[in-house]
């Protein structure tokens, strides 16, 4: 029988509920329990796939092809449990399914309402796919009081009544602000947030109080008195120097022990946190440092590249070095040629990440050219690989080489994928069709040249599986021209039609991949491509 932990937030958004859920899941896992974490997103989009990165941040893609919230990346990185489509639901998807059923006549003429139809759909999602789990953690997006989240709160209230006693627990994340002028922490926002939650029929069992300054015992007792919880259930959550120290910090404050106590578990095994100790030791005690430039389009919001940022950190952990990331707007290079050398020369590695659209593309191509000519370690991901191929084609004499994503071109080195193979068979897409859910999404296999640099990076593997999210693909018709210029196709789809990896054997480290390796990197198991890239950057740092 799985136990359920419902995680809500109050006072303000962006308190770190996702990180808290991931940390608690990791702590329970360290005690030997099987856990899975799910995310309820109240927005009306069916999924975040068509949302602006500036609005939503990164779209995290699962093995089974779901476009999900970036918090699922935290869940997977902290627990090592692969996220899947059934771990994320939105109001948009709930309503889409309900309206489709109504149109089919599945409700037999009944009036379709928020209660019971919407709340039942949410409950069914929460209860599905238990897989002999010990704990299922459910994070509810947004803030208590948001009108969009009311059906989710009602579904939680019903579940807490319907499930067995001590089978559910509510954790509420709040803010205890510090008023500098008064020199005081203020508990009133937390009190009001708990009162708002209680008005919806949900009494929190544990309060996680985010604060900039230590929470004195007197303030903890005050919160406990006014919010009707034990003092030990008021857990301070101070700002941490690294997200990878958060699980250890929460354990020190007694979060996991208090949660287990809420379920009546008093004899739980002690947690094995040695892996977390090793990660934090490597993070806080590096033996060197490198500087990596990320030349992208959405650098104004680093959450747009959340998994990429973390994967670079993981590469640093693998090599025991600190990774300094410089976020560079690719458009700068289109406006000022002198900026290219000024911004790129100090770097030990250049990375061009995935993205969409023409804006900044010429700046990215200029970055590829700089890395190729100056022999600086280069890593191109998704669109970054496509830019590397366009740059290579231009160098090979195809001056008009471009992508059909950017408009009509006489030299379509990159074009839209019209069909590709999935486990279910051939999947097709028409240009001009719907954007949502129509990309090549999820895990696909690739075959590697056993004599290639990339195969060596993967430990000699000739077959790999990586996650994809793209509509456009390098045109294999240009393979001979590109390989003649030195850009080798070292990885292809199993049917040999879709290029997956390119590399330059005459370069210290030049790799482009069509997939997103950052989505599978973890602090305990850094992705080999990021480990190799940072290792090459470390070597470069010793040359300059």
Swiss-Prot record:
Q: Which GO terms describe its cellular component?
A: cytosol
Which Pfam families does the record cross-reference, listed alphabetically? CTP_synth_N, GATase
**Residues that, per the record, bind L-glutamine:** 54, 355, 383-386, 405, 471
Q: What is its pathway?
A: Pyrimidine metabolism; CTP biosynthesis via de novo pathway; CTP from UDP: step 2/2
Q: Active site annotated at which positions?
A: 382 (nucleophile), 516, 518
**Classification via InterPro entries:** Class_I_gatase-like, CTP_synthase, CTP_synthase_N, GATASE, GATase1_CTP_Synthase, P-loop_NTPase
Q: Which CDD domains match?
A: CTPS_N, GATase1_CTP_Synthase
Tell me where on the tree of life, at the top rank, the source sits: Bacteria
Annotated GO biological process: 'de novo' CTP biosynthetic process; pyrimidine nucleobase biosynthetic process
- Enzyme Commission code: 6.3.4.2
GO MF terms listed in the record are: ATP binding; CTP synthase activity; glutaminase activity; identical protein binding; metal ion binding
- Which keywords does this Swiss-Prot/TrEMBL entry list? ATP-binding, Glutamine amidotransferase, Ligase, Magnesium, Metal-binding, Nucleotide-binding, Pyrimidine biosynthesis
Can you give the residue ranges of the Glutamine amidotransferase type-1 domain? 291-543
Record: residues binding CTP: 13, 146-148, 186-191, 222
SUPFAM superfamilies for this protein: Class I glutamine amidotransferase-like (SSF52317), P-loop containing nucleoside triphosphate hydrolases (SSF52540)
Q: Where does Mg(2+) bind?
A: 71, 139
Where is UTP bound in this sequence? 13, 186-191, 222
Q: How is this protein's activity controlled? A: Allosterically activated by GTP, when glutamine is the substrate; GTP has no effect on the reaction when ammonia is the substrate. The allosteric effector GTP functions by stabilizing the protein conformation that binds the tetrahedral intermediate(s) formed during glutamine hydrolysis. Inhibited by the product CTP, via allosteric rather than competitive inhibition.
Q: Which reaction does it catalyse?
A: UTP + L-glutamine + ATP + H2O = CTP + L-glutamate + ADP + phosphate + 2 H(+); L-glutamine + H2O = L-glutamate + NH4(+); UTP + NH4(+) + ATP = CTP + ADP + phosphate + 2 H(+)
Region described as Amidoligase domain: 1-265
Q: Which residues bind ATP?
A: 14-19, 71
> How does this polypeptide assemble, per the annotation?
Homotetramer.
Q: Main role?
A: Catalyzes the ATP-dependent amination of UTP to CTP with either L-glutamine or ammonia as the source of nitrogen. Regulates intracellular CTP levels through interactions with the four ribonucleotide triphosphates.
The record's similarity note reads:
Belongs to the CTP synthase family.
Additional detail: CTPSs have evolved a hybrid strategy for distinguishing between UTP and CTP. The overlapping regions of the product feedback inhibitory and substrate sites recognize a common feature in both compounds, the triphosphate moiety. To differentiate isosteric substrate and product pyrimidine rings, an additional pocket far from the expected kinase/ligase catalytic site, specifically recognizes the cytosine and ribose portions of the product inhibitor.
Tell me what this protein is called: CTP synthase
Organism classification = Bacteria, Pseudomonadati, Pseudomonadota, Alphaproteobacteria, Sphingomonadales
């Amino acid at each position: 029988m799985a136990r359920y932990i419902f995680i809500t937030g109050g006072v303000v958004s962006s308190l770190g509920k996702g990180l808290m859920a991931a940390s608690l899941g990791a702590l329970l896992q360290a005690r030997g329990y099987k856990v899975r974490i799910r995310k309820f997103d109240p927005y009306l989009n069916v999924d975040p796939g068509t949302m602006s990165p500036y609005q939503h941040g990164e779209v995290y893609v699962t093995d089974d092809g779901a476009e999900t919230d970036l918090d699922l990346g935290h869940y997977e990185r902290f627990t090592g449990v692969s996220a899947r489509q059934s771990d994320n639901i939105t109001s948009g998807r709930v309503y889409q399914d309900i309206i489709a059923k109504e149109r089919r006549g599945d409700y037999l003429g009944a009036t379709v309402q928020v209660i019971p139809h919407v709340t039942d759909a949410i409950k069914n999602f929460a209860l599905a796919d238990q897989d002999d789990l010990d704990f299922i953690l459910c994070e509810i997006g947004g803030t208590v009081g948001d009108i969009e989240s009311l059906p989710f709160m009602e579904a939680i209230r019903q579940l807490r009544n319907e499930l067995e006693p001590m089978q559910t627990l509510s954790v509420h994340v709040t803010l205890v602000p510090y008023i500098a002028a008064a020199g005081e922490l203020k508990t009133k926002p937390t009190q009001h947030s708990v009162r708002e939650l209680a008005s919806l029929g949900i009494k929190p069992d544990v309060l996680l109080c985010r604060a900039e300054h230590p929470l004195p015992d007197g303030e903890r007792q005050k919160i406990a008195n006014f919010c009707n919880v034990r003092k030990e259930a008021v857990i301070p959550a101070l700002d941490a120097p690294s997200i990878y120290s958060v699980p250890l910090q929460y354990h020190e404050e007694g979060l996991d022990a208090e949660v287990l106590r809420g379920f009546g578990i008093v004899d739980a095994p002690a947690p094995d946190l040695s892996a977390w100790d090793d990660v934090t030791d490597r993070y806080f005690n590096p033996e060197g440092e490198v500087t990596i430039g990320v030349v992208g389009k959405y650098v104004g919001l680093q959450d747009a590249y959340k998994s990429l940022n973390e994967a670079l950190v993981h590469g640093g952990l693998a090599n025991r070095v600190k990774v300094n990331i410089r976020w560079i707007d690719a458009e700068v290079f289109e406006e000022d040629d002198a900026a290219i050398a000024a911004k790129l020369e100090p770097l030990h590695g250049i990375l061009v990440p995935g993205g969409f659209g023409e804006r900044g593309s010429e700046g990215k191509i200029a970055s590829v050219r700089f890395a190729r000519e100056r022999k600086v370690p280069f890593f191109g991901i998704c669109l970054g690989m496509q830019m590397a191929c366009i740059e290579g084609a231009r160098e090979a004499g195809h001056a008009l080489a471009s992508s059909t994503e950017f408009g009509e071109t006489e030299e379509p080195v990159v074009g839209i994928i019209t069909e590709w193979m999935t486990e279910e068979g051939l999947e097709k897409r028409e240009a001009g069709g719907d954007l949502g859910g129509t990309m090549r999404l999820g895990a696909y296999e690739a075959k590697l040249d056993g004599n290639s640099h990339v195969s060596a990076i993967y430990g000699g593997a000739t077959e790999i599986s990586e996650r994809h999210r793209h509509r456009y693909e390098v045109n294999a018709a240009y393979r001979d021209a590109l390989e003649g210029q030195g850009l080798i196709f070292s990885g292809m789809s199993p049917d040999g039609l879709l290029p997956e990896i390119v590399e330059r054997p005459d370069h210290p480290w030049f790799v482009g991949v069509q997939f997103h390796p950052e989505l599978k990197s973890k602090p305990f198991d850094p992705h080999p491509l990021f480990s190799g890239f940072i290792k090459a950057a470390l070597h470069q740092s010793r040359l300059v």
